[in-house]
Amino acid sequence: MDITLTSLEMEHSRLLGNKIATEITSQGGWIPFSRYMEMALYEPGMGYYSAGAHKLGVGGDFTTAPELSPLFGAAIVSTLLPVLQGLKAQGLPSQILEFGAGTGKLAQSILSRLNDLGFVLDRYDIIEISPDLAQRQQEGLNKLASELNLRTKCSWLNTLPNNFKGVILANEVIDAIPCDTLIYQNGFWYWYGVSLAANTFIWKVGKPVEQASLPECLLTGNFSEGYTTELHPQANAWVRQMAKQLDTGLFLTLDYGFPESEYYHPQRMEGTLLAHHRHHAIQDPFHLPGLFDLTSHVEWAHSARSALADNDDDVFLTNQAAFLLDAGIGEIALEIGDPSNPKTFLPISNSLQKLLSEAEMGELFKAFAFSKQLDDLLPRQTLEDLPGLRGRNRL
């Protein structure tokens, strides 16, 4: 992969690499991959998300669904609106809290759609760890608020409030939570971590994985020698924390991933770990630390169990295509575009193709939701009565 980098970028990566190397040395020559990923992405002032860089969109490293089309956010509104209306009906603030809002495109499209529908949202809060992205979010939302004369209060928070009543939203967040890697050797699973050889990061086998940490399918499946995959204790803990702190309302996330049986399929020999840079993906996570985004697919079964551990009302999983179609994305497209005018409708059609096609984002990306005390807001309704979540539950 041919990458042209500035001297500043090279120096940035070198400094972060040195810091990670020092960490490895201080830990006896080996660290879990989750620690490497944490430093590569989030080391203050140096990690991929902590340092300023153009990460999203055409000129960035990857493009998310909100960047493709405002239809994505408009369709999500169909799911959120009944919950927001229920909050207002109970005399509570109608509020959305978004984690990792990227460039702010999703927030903008949601607020624009709510404005078109005549609904005044009380609060739209964002939790964002990237200073660069937070600035871009503020600029975009301030401009939108001025153009539409919005009355919604937008704020940037450091943590999710306890006993939150409202909607929690996260698009492509869980995939960037550090994961642990493991390898199958001689009939046993071992932690697969990071070490150093000639000042280069290398994979190195660690201690055996405790059986209690392994999904049942990894204990009973037939795996080939050298099979590698991931575990997601931090991501599962994050979902569990969301469930604990959501008092009343809805949690909705969209991300790429698989159910457990597909995630740990014996033929998926090298797991799902990828590094992204300027719309290219490679499997070497040690290449230019701090300049590549590191991700792994979400394993949805354990996410669901984490949510259910806090006694949520309902948990739901479907693919992105089914979610968006049930949320009315096709009808919304016809509202804003004229199919008889190919010049204006072709971009809309192209974005729909990418969002819905099984070969693009339609199947790999999933919509995962859970609710808490939804009946308090929407009497005699369940999670599966909300637009977008009325199809087959894949959990």
Named regions from a protein language model:
Residues 72, 168, 255:
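Conserved RecA-like P-loop NTPase ATPase core
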Residues 1-99, 103-165, 336, 350-395:
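Rossmann-like AdoMet
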Residues 167-216, 266-276:
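A mobile, often basic/glycine-rich helix-loop segment
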Residues 134, 165, 177-178, 261:
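Conserved protein kinase catalytic core
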Residues 131, 174, 258:
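Short, glycine/acidic-enriched loop or turn micro-motifs at the edges of active sites
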Residues 49, 176-179, 262, 377-379:
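Short helix/loop capping segments that flank catalytic or ligand/cofactor-binding pockets
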Residues 40, 168, 303:
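A residue-level signal for conserved active-site and pocket-lining positions in enzyme catalytic cores
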Residues 214-395:
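Long, Lys/Arg- and hydrophobic-enriched amphipathic alpha-helices
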